Amino acid sequence: LDNGGNISWSPDGRRIAYIQTDSSKVRRRPVVHPTDPTYPEVTLERFARVGTPIPTLRVGVVDSEGGATQWVKLPSDPGTFYINSVSWAGNSKELLIEMLSRSRDNRKFLLANIEKGEIATAYEETDPAWIDASYSANAGLEWIHDGKEFVLISERGGWRQAYVISRDGKQRKLLTKDKSDIIARGPVDKSGGWFYYIASPKNATQRYLYRIRLDGKSDPERVTPDDQPGTHSYE
């Protein structure tokens, strides 16, 4: 068992959430490590191929001072899904769990109430081909409006765009309506009500900083000065 993945402390520091991985049923395959071309080493590493068992995953929460683990009752059978991320949902009572089907055609964000043992779907998307998880350019989910909503990057509409999702999953609002990809997300100005991002809606060889209102009631505003064409990066 590998218990070290994706550890997340609750905001109040009282709980620790983590993903437990059991790869004991995953077959091993030989891998050559040619670090020494004269005598290369061969190791056996676990690797799940199509139709063979994948690791079984579960989410646990433990008190920071020790004690028994409280396991989250996920709505799918073990060995049929992946867990991309586990984070605290803007408070110290609920977890936001990102689950992916094994075939990667379904993605869910589940809200798990640790104290009540309840779980609900906050967001779900499907695609007959492939769904990217929240990493790399799609990473950076962030809670806004006192935890009532969160900003999510998704390619559900064919472009990498930003959405505002209500906590109960009943409302979904598209922020970046241009038919172009968000190249990289920037910070969320919660007090000012802005979402910042890098994009190149008119010329793929250029990159500019844009921002848009979190309420979705404005057009994108280019922050990079108009007299500075080219590729821009910001920190």
Please report, for each region that a protein language model flagged, where it lies by residue:
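N-terminal targeting or regulatory segments adjacent to alpha/beta-hydrolase or S9 domains
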Residues: 14, 19, 60, 187-235
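Surface-exposed loop and turn segments in beta-propeller and other repeat-based domains
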Residues: 1, 50, 54-61, 65-79, ...
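Predominantly five- to eight-bladed beta-propeller fold
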Residues: 1-8, 15-74
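Short loop/turn segments that connect beta-strands within beta-propeller blades
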Residues: 63-67, 113-117, 166-170, 213-217
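Repeated scaffold domains used in trafficking and secretory/extracellular systems
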Residues: 84, 136-140, 182-188, 231-235
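A short loop-to-beta-strand structural motif that recurs across blades of beta-propeller domains
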Residues: 58-60, 108-110, 161-163, 208-210
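Beta-strand C-termini and the immediately following turn/loop, strongest in propeller blades
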Residues: 5-8, 17-23, 49-53, 87-90, ...
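Long hydrophobic segments that form regular secondary structure
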Residues: 64, 68-101
